[in-house]
Amino acid sequence: MPAKQTSGKGAKKAGKAKGRPSGASKTRRRKRKESYGIYIYKVLKQVHPDTGISSKAMSIMNSFVNDVFERIAGEASRLSQYNKKSTISSREVQTAVRLLLPGELAKHAVSEGTKAVTKYTTSK
């Protein structure tokens, strides 16, 4: 039996494989930046309907919300580790808020959080 030929009419040539059809462009989709901007704006309009906010102020507020979120999440994580639990519950979050926020601010935050959790559980 004769050996197969690799060159000749039927042989495939090694080269670049065509990945995209001949009309497609190389434009890449931009990654979306997530922020709390729309929620900050909604709260602003509830409290002061006639007041606006600059993009610089919005950026500062967004950084503030991210910072507070990270602090509360970190503290709640530590509390769940101390209690040998693998899940962060509303109890850990509430305790973290009490530890991180001072006096009256903590009381208001806890009551608003409790109200939000109650509203969520009743809507289910």
From Swiss-Prot:
Ranges annotated as spanning the membrane: none
Lineage: Eukaryota, Metazoa, Echinodermata, Eleutherozoa, Echinozoa
Principal cellular location given in the protein's record: nucleus
Region annotation Disordered: where it falls in the sequence: 1-32
Annotated PANTHER family: HISTONE H2B (PTHR23428)
InterPro entries given in the database record: Histone-fold, Histone_H2A/H2B/H3, Histone_H2B, HISTONE_H2B_site
Annotated glycan sites: S111
Subcellular location(s) per record: Nucleus; Chromosome
Subunit annotation: The nucleosome is a histone octamer containing two molecules each of H2A, H2B, H3 and H4 assembled in one H3-H4 heterotetramer and two H2A-H2B heterodimers. The octamer wraps approximately 147 bp of DNA.
Organism the protein comes from: Psammechinus miliaris
One GO MF term attached to the UniProt entry: protein heterodimerization activity
Protein name: Late histone H2B.2.2
Position of the Glycyl lysine isopeptide (Lys-Gly) (interchain with G-Cter in ubiquitin) cross-link: K119
Gene Ontology CC terms: nucleosome; nucleus
Keyword line: Chromosome, DNA-binding, Glycoprotein, Isopeptide bond, Nucleosome core, Nucleus, Ubl conjugation
Function: Core component of nucleosome. Nucleosomes wrap and compact DNA into chromatin, limiting DNA accessibility to the cellular machineries which require DNA as a template. Histones thereby play a central role in transcription regulation, DNA repair, DNA replication and chromosomal stability. DNA accessibility is regulated via a complex set of post-translational modifications of histones, also called histone code, and nucleosome remodeling.
Any Pfam family matching the protein: Histone
Start-end of Basic residues biased regions: 10-19
Family that this chain belongs to: Belongs to the histone H2B family.
Modification(s) after translation: Monoubiquitination of Lys-119 gives a specific tag for epigenetic transcriptional activation and is also prerequisite for histone H3 'Lys-4' and 'Lys-79' methylation.
